């Protein structure tokens, strides 16, 4: 018999297969409203990852920008949409080829940091993560990308 360590949700989103230790960062970048019930499991056993984190958000379906942010921090994550206690959609997150408006450029002289221009990055490499600013051509690696998520 399977043991459920984190209670099920009626309607919302489950973010599963987050690498162990990255769940709180995922939660932080999602900036969820206080009225959502949020369940977090950290460092639970996983056949796929050995250990993983899980986040369940009652009453919230993630938008594309939120899923893209998760992909930058936790590329092994899966996003499950729940309705009436059942998984109605399941998808693996994927780093897109181009990222617009969710990361601030690390170059203080970049036009995106002083004009009303949405930051835009081309993904040079997904593993390891490396992005290049469309405007100033500054490259950023994973640790800098995570620090500059909007």
Swiss-Prot record:
Named cofactor requirement(s): Zn(2+)
Gene3D superfamilies tied to this protein: Aspartate carbamoyltransferase regulatory subunit, C-terminal domain (2.30.30.20), Aspartate carbamoyltransferase regulatory subunit, N-terminal domain (3.30.70.140)
Lineage: superkingdom: Archaea
Any one biological process term the GO annotation gives: 'de novo' pyrimidine nucleobase biosynthetic process
A GO molecular-function annotation: metal ion binding
Sites where the protein binds Zn(2+): 105, 110, 133, 136
InterPro entries per UniProt: Asp_carbamoyltransf_reg_N, Asp_carbamoylTrfase_reg, Asp_carbamoyltrfase_reg_C, Asp_carbatrfase_reg_C_sf, Asp_carbatrfase_reg_N_sf
Manner of cofactor binding, per the entry note: Binds 1 zinc ion per subunit.
Record key words, sorted: Metal-binding, Pyrimidine biosynthesis, Zinc
Pfam family, one: PyrI
Keyword Disulfide bond: no
Keyword Zinc: yes
GO cellular component, one term: aspartate carbamoyltransferase complex
Signal sequence interval, chain numbering: none
General function of this protein: Involved in allosteric regulation of aspartate carbamoyltransferase.
Similarity section: Belongs to the PyrI family.
Name of the protein this chain belongs to: Aspartate carbamoyltransferase regulatory chain
Native source organism of the sequence: Thermococcus sibiricus (strain DSM 12597 / MM 739)
């Amino acid at each position: 018999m399977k043991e459920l360590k984190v209670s099920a949700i009626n309607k919302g989103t489950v973010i599963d297969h987050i690498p162990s230790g990255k769940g709180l960062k995922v939660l932080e970048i999602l900036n969820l409203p206080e009225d959502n019930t949020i369940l977090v499991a950290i460092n639970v056993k996983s056949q796929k990852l050995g250990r993983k984190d899980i986040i369940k958000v009652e009453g919230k379906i993630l938008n594309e920008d939120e899923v893209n942010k998760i992909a930058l921090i936790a590329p092994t994550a899966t996003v499950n949409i729940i309705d009436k206690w059942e998984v109605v959609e399941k998808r693996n997150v994927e780093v897109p080829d181009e990222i617009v408006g969710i990361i601030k450029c690390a170059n203080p002289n970049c036009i995106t940091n002083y004009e009303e221009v949405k930051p835009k990055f081309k993904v040079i490499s997904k593993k390891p993560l490396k992005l290049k600013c469309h405007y100033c051509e500054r490259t950023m690696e994973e640790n800098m990308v995570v620090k500059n998520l909007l």
